[in-house]
Amino acid sequence: MTEQRKVCLRGSGLTKVFGFGRQKTLAVDHVDFSFYEGEIVSIVGESGSGKTTLAKMLLGLINPTEGEVYFQGKERDIGTHKKKKEYWKNIQAIFQDPFSSYNIFHKIDAVLLDCINMRGGRKYPYERKVE
């Protein structure tokens, strides 16, 4: 029997543009994703690739220019301070110092495999873990 995983956080077409006219900067460009209950997610990328901007949109700290965030199957509603506080009780991000997070001499798949194995992922084949 196949295990049915529930989507807890989903983004559709998330885009963030800062500035306007010739000073316009496209920080996040139409990102789609689904995060599932019980899943640990790490967003990695080069400096300036939009990781922090995406995280701030997911947390509701900044609004997307386009796109929607869905939480527990419904369009996220954080229009009031009270609703935002309630949302924040259910979601968390951990921003890390990049120099203390990863060993630059290890390949990223080896670093992520260590994390997966620590969380009980030893039962999955290597290919499934790093896909």
Give the predicted meaning of each segment:
Residues 44-46:
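The feature captures the beta-strand-to-loop junction immediately N-terminal to the Walker
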Residues 59:
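Helix-to-loop junction immediately C-terminal to a conserved catalytic motif
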Residues 42, 85-96, 110:
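ABC nucleotide-binding domain signature
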Residues 97, 104-118:
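Q-loop/switch helix immediately C-terminal to the Walker
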Residues 67-77:
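Conserved ABC transporter NBD signature motif
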Residues 5-8, 17-30, 37, 80-83, ...:
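A short, flexible loop at the N-terminus of ABC-type nucleotide-binding domains that lies
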Residues 76-92, 118:
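ABC ATPase NBD coupling module
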Residues 52-53:
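Conserved Walker
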